[in-house]
């Protein structure tokens, strides 16, 4: 059925379907959950889609306008689990509730859409991940007079917390920005040609006029209750203001109300944080492994936070390391104070207190949207009540750390808010207002009176039962209640002749009769009416409490922010103490100095980790790293980047000591993977990432290059690797860790004194190999590639053939006086000492016994096979001598 019927066409439907179709017309691209009794129903195409996505039963009931009505539904009490599934699939859902009274309605009960649930506007606890923020982002491309794109304005909002941010970026930085922000939903204008990277988030097209710059700027000012945006540094960000206007319009429309908690704005600048492109975030496994799991990552190692607010802030810090060392030093000062705290303010006691803290940030968001539930408010009350004791834990050390002093001041409990919550909300309220028992006794006299009537029913019934037994002489007479028939007096069949005349039969059972008396009927009317009136009164009072709490939203947000920061700092302190980390230092001079550094994540996975030094300075800008596969080259490079990032985030670091000069960006070119969706080969991906590094790296950038050039032929790869390394030294001048299997590159320090060779060593043991994982000065002299292949389980015949062919390649290389292109092997033997099945035969025939010996591996022989081989070799020698060979 076509849901775009004209108004005239709609009139041919039943009244209820007319109502539905009008609502659906306002939400054409959204699934409409239409409330009918205890179910949310979907109709027509929505029903078909929901049945497919949610595995619901698709039914067909009746017809409207001559068309069968396809239906699918979900029970209202389980709606959140279905919403969660749909949102995860990128779908949006309009929740249409009954707002009219069925008892007084003529025709269909009045209904309206009360909110729209979209991937980027989630606030319900059941739909949100505890440790992940959800962002709605709008993007608008600014053009010059010639129609050329000059920038992209971004505005993104965390609706659950009210955090709003703006930025303007270069068009080619969009992918990196989206990877950093990771929005769940992206708003773009109808007809816009901006290409949103695949997988960046669910894309929603909205009318282009929503992005009008003048309207957006005014809407932003109205939202923040300011006359202008100069105080936020946003007055010149016209493209971002256009995006913000569309964002606020969309977010408010989905909630059907004002966004009362969006009262602050932060403008992000490219120079504010250390640059991390998508490849770097992926390769360093900050919050997700290369396999797509959440552990083991740097985040999973660091996240010992006691609150979900702290866990979310930690994730944000890891993706936003500040360039200025001032912020890092302030955080590290706080960590030091927490570690040195006296016994009465020790770290364990503080963290124990933090575990009792609720998610104030998200509760405040729901409060602002008037969707907070009773237990949200009781959790808020209990958290505020615990703040004085929490402040006592840190009061003794605030003088030693400015960050802790700032946190302490922000944790002052909002007294009026706490008083209201304490007086209004029951100690242990029900989950939902409709269940009653939410408002505290003593808060409202009328509610208390109605409750007394309902709650005193029990005693009245006991007294009535005793009186009626005495009056009638029926010893087993009972006075009871059920929801279907209300209150009644039950008399067994054999005693009905004793029933007084004022008993009126209410229900006949097989073995008993149920009656009601005028006195019981009067009480029933009063009791049931009191219960209904009490629930209605409680609903009204609860709504009033929500309204009364709205002025305290800024104070609640202040407390939430301070609690999250304190939690992360305490987690950093716990990690530093448990894992033996140290406070790094910072300098304005060029350089990185790490003594006995360790990879934080790998160290946690192994029994013993070999620590290594890393030094950069004005005289040492590029380290050529050679050594065997599995020797630890990639681990060494990654640990250097992670230690640097941790230092600037504000954490202690896994090292004996560490000192860092300024770092503006971290780049990585690690691993091999193609981009099938983008039609790019492994080598193309490698070169694209290398190009970005060569174009953007500065003398303050840290660059990790792992085996560049391996995706093409040997000579092409070697030439590219040499040229790239040379450019990084001569042009970029950045700190570079350059791992390679091209031995020729180890000659680079002779041309550039700022380059140095280091290697990871290993030793052979029989036909095996032991990796030492220690970084030493100088180049490696062997790759141990065949030994690694043997460890990997490559069949022995393949290993033997590889050894023979390696010998041949070495012979050819020596004969042609060309450099050895293989993996750092030892100098080749003299040509006349090398034999290989694939090499041209020498002028004199080789001895057959020698050929046979070359084909065997003694380690593979059993005792009997060795004896048989000995006899075989003797036969070959005698046969060879008999043929007249010397």
Curated annotation (Swiss-Prot):
Disulfide bonds: none annotated. One of its GO terms (biological process) is mismatch repair. Residues 834-857 are annotated as: Disordered. Pfam families: MutS_I, MutS_II, MutS_III, MutS_IV, MutS_V. Keywords: ATP-binding, DNA damage, DNA repair, DNA-binding, Nucleotide-binding. ATP binds at residues 627-634. GO terms for molecular function: ATP binding; ATP-dependent DNA damage sensor activity; damaged DNA binding; mismatched DNA binding. One of its GO terms (cellular component) is cytosol. PROSITE patterns: DNA_MISMATCH_REPAIR_2. Belongs to the DNA mismatch repair MutS family. This protein is involved in the repair of mismatches in DNA. It is possible that it carries out the mismatch recognition step. This protein has a weak ATPase activity. HAMAP family: MutS. This is DNA mismatch repair protein MutS. It comes from Burkholderia vietnamiensis (strain G4 / LMG 22486). The gene is mutS.
């Amino acid at each position: 059925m076509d849901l775009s019927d004209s108004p005239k066409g709609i009139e041919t439907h039943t009244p209820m379907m007319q109502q539905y179709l009008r609502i659906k017309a306002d939400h054409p691209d959204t699934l409409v959950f239409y409330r009918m009794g205890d179910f949310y129903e979907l109709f027509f195409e929505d029903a078909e889609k929901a049945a497919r996505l949610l595995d619901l039963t698709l039914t067909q009931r009746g017809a409207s306008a001559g068309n069968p009505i396809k239906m699918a539904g979900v029970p209202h009490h389980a709606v959140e689990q279905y919403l969660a599934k749909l949102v995860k699939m990128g779908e949006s859902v309009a929740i249409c509730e009954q707002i009219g009274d069925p008892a007084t309605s003529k025709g269909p009960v009045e209904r309206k859409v009360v909110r729209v649930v979209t991937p980027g506007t989630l606030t319900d606890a059941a739909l949100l991940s505890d440790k992940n923020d959800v962002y709605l982002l709008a993007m608008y491309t600014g053009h010059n007079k010639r129609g050329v794109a000059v920038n992209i304005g971004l505005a993104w909002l965390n609706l659950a917390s009210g955090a709003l941010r703006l930025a303007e970026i270069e068009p080619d930085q969009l992918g990196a920005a989206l990877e950093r922000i990771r929005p769940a939903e992206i708003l773009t204008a109808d007809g816009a040609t901006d290409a949103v990277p695949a997988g960046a988030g669910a894309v929603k097209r909205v009318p282009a006029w929503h992005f009008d710059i003048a309207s957006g700027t005014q809407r932003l000012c109205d939202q923040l209750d300011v006359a202008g945006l100069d105080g936020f540094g946003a007055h010149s960000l016209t493209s971002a203001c256009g995006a913000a206007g569309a964002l606020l319009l969309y977010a408010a429309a989905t909630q059907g109300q004002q966004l009362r908690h969006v009262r602050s704005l932060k403008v992000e600048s490219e120079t504010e944080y250390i640059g991390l492109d998508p490849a770097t975030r992926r390769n360093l496994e900050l919050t997700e492994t290369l396999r797509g799991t959440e552990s083991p990552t740097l985040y999973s190692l660091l996240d010992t936070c006691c609150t979900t607010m702290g866990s979310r802030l930690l994730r944000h810090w890891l993706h936003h390391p500040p360039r200025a060392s001032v912020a890092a030093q302030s955080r590290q000062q706080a960590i030091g104070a927490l570690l040195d705290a006296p016994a009465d303010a020790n770290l364990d006691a503080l963290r124990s207190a933090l575990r009792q803290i609720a998610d104030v940030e998200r509760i405040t968001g729901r409060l602002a949207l008037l969707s907070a539930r009773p237990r949200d408010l009781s959790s808020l009350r209990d958290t505020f009540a615990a703040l004085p004791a929490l402040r006592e834990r840190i009061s003794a050390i605030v003088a030693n750390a400015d960050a802790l002093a700032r946190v302490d001041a922000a944790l002052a409990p909002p007294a009026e808010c706490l008083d209201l919550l304490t007086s209004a909300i029951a100690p242990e309220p029900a989950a939902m207002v409709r269940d009653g028992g939410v408002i505290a006794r003593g808060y409202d006299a009328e509610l208390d009176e109605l409750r007394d009537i309902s709650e005193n029913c029990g005693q009245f019934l006991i007294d009535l039962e005793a009186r009626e037994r005495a009056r009638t002489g029926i010893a087993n007479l009972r006075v009871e209640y059920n929801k279907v028939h209300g209150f009644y007096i039950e008399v067994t069949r054999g005693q009905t002749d004793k029933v007084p005349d004022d008993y009126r039969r209410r229900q006949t059972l097989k073995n008993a009769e149920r009656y009601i008396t005028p006195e019981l009927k009067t009480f029933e009317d009063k009791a049931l009416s009191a219960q209904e009136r009490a629930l209605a009164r409680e609903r009204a009072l609860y709504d009033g409490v929500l309204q009364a709490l709205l002025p305290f939203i800024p104070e609640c947000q202040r407390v939430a922010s301070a609690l999250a920061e304190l939690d992360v700092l305490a987690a950093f302190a716990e990690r530093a103490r448990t894992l033996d980390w140290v406070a790094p230092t910072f300098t304005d001079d060029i350089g990185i100095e790490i003594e006995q550094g360790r990879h934080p994540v790998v160290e946690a996975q192994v029994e013993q980790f070999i620590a290594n030094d890393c030094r950069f300075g004005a005289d040492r800008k590029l380290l050529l790293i050679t050594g065997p596969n599995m020797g630890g080259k990639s681990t060494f490079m990654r640990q250097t980047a992670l230690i640097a990032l941790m230092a600037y985030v504000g954490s202690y670091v896994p090292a004996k000591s560490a000192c860092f000069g300024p770092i503006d960006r971290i780049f990585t070119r690690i691993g091999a993977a193609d981009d099938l969706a983008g039609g790019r080969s492994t080598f193309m991906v490698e070169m694209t990432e290398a190009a970005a590094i060569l174009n953007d790296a500065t003398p303050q950038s840290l660059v990790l290059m792992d085996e560049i050039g391996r995706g093409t032929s040997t000579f092409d790869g070697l030439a590219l690797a040499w040229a790239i390394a040379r450019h990084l030294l001569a042009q970029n001048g950045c700190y570079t860790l350059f791992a390679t299997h091209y031995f020729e590159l180890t000659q680079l320090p002779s041309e550039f004194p700022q380059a140095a060779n280091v290697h990871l060593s290993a030793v052979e043991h029989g036909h095996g190999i032991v990796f030492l994982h220690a970084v030493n000065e100088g180049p490696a002299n062997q790759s141990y590639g065949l030994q690694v292949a043997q460890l990997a389980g490559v069949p022995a015949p393949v290993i033997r053939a590889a050894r023979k062919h390696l010998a041949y390649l070495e012979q050819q290389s020596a004969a042609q006086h060309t450099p050895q292109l293989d993996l750092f092997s030892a100098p080749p033997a003299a040509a006349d000492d090398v034999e290989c099945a694939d090499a041209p035969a020498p002028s004199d025939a080789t001895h057959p016994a020698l050929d046979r010996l070359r084909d065997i591996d003694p380690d593979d022989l059993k005792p009997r096979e060795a004896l048989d081989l000995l006899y075989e070799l003797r036969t070959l020698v005698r046969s060879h001598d008999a043929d007249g060979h010397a």
